[in-house]
């Protein structure tokens, strides 16, 4: 409750009744990290990165970039190395573009989303559960 409340105050959002979705990531594939905004069903994204410092992060591979627009991974406002318990929280919106340079390998993160409380969110959570289930068998 304290985390939810702090995020709600920080971003001026009402999150009291927002469902949550939790995602555990251990690896990224070549296609991961493409420039995108999150689904409109996701109101807030919380990322906790659990990786040790390595040379890959120093070369900016796999470091999340909060972008100024959809067209250029190099046009970023902030770059966040996914290391040492770094916590990143951002509200979703039509201009919250983000992504990272291609990185294939271990990239551990816990992602918590505060979701919209409607049909879009329920659909997104069903899709998420199905995706998580299939990844167990396909790696």
Regions found by a protein language model. Give the residues of each.
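A short, highly charged nucleic-acid-interacting micro-segment common to nuclease
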Residues: 1
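Catalytic core of non-heme Fe(II) oxygenases with the double-stranded beta-helix
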Residues: 4-129
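Low-complexity, Gly/Ser/Thr/Pro-rich intrinsically disordered linker/tail segments
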Residues: 128-139
């Amino acid at each position: 409750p304290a985390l939810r409340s702090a995020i709600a105050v920080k971003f001026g959002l009402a999150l009291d009744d927002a469902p949550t979705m939790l995602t555990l990531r251990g690896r990224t594939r070549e296609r991961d990290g493409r420039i995108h905004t999150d689904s409109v069903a996701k109101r807030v994204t919380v990322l906790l990165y659990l990786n040790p410092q390595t040379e890959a992060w120093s070369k900016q591979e796999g470091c999340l970039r909060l972008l100024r627009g959809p067209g250029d991974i190099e046009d970023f406002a902030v770059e966040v190395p996914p290391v040492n318990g770094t916590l990143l929280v951002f509200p979703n919106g039509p201009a919250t573009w983000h992504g990272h340079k291609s990185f294939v390998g271990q990239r551990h993160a816990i992602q918590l989303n505060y979701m919209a409380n409607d049909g879009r969110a329920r659909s997104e959570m069903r899709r998420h559960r199905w995706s998580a289930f299939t990844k167990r068998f396909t790696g």
